[in-house]
Amino acid sequence: MSYENIQVKDDGGVRIVTINRPSPLNPLSMGTLREIRDAVLNSGNRVVTLTGANKAFSAGADINGFVGLDGAAAFALATEGHDIMNSIAGYPRPVIAAIHGYAFGGGFELALSCDIRISRPKTLFALPEINLGILPGWGGTQRLRHLVGENVAFEIISTGRRFSAEEAKELRIVNRVSENYLDDAVALARELAKKPRESLKLVKKLVRYQPDDVFEEEKEAFGVVFNHPDMKEGVQAFLEKREPKFLDK
């Protein structure tokens, strides 16, 4: 199958999926996410390495697509995004994120849906949605909490601050920081591809288990904030490259 927004390369038991949008920061449209899901789920049971071309893994969702969304449309967007992230997280073979540049917002949530994360040293991470008057809507609140605990997850999400690959490793968000991040990810994928498939599938299922209902309130909350005027102000301020003037603070 041919793709518009990603590149796919198969190497034995490994598939390398590269996000390659026209923008150098690889913003995630829903079409891009659908292509990533298709490339992962139809990889012929290969171990997958997911990375980004150009300057970033992904700087997040395409904010232009948020303009004009109401609560119902936002809930539908969150629901499809959740379905895609859950499909990647639930893929029975390991998925390794090779991250560089930026992993912001939906790009960070995409990385969190992977099983292992290997980062280049100068990579920056953030869930900055709070600064747009919204919140992470593709599983980020729950997957981050699962990794770092409630206190750290709350601080990261409520401030929207950026943090380094080194801090991400200290917080156990990333497994490894390496200048050779992509080569290391592919080498690890090749190693995992040699492991017994059924045992590895069950290990992943048990270690990664999260009840489905933990994501329901996040989707509902994502829809709620899109009906608030602060969301419209936050998105408009972002697009106009100015500080937002939130009413409800």
Predicted regions and their residues:
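Conserved CoA-thioester-binding segment of acyl-CoA-metabolizing enzymes
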Residues: M1-A53, N86
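C-terminal long alpha-helix characteristic of the crotonase
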Residues: P22, R34, I118-T123, L171-K219, ...
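Glycine- (often His-adjacent) and acidic-residue-rich active-site loop
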Residues: G52-S87, A103
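CoA-thioester-processing core
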Residues: I84, I88-G90, A98, F104-S158, ...
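Acidic, divalent-metal-coordinating active-site segment for phosphoryl/phosphodiester hydrolysis
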Residues: R161-E167
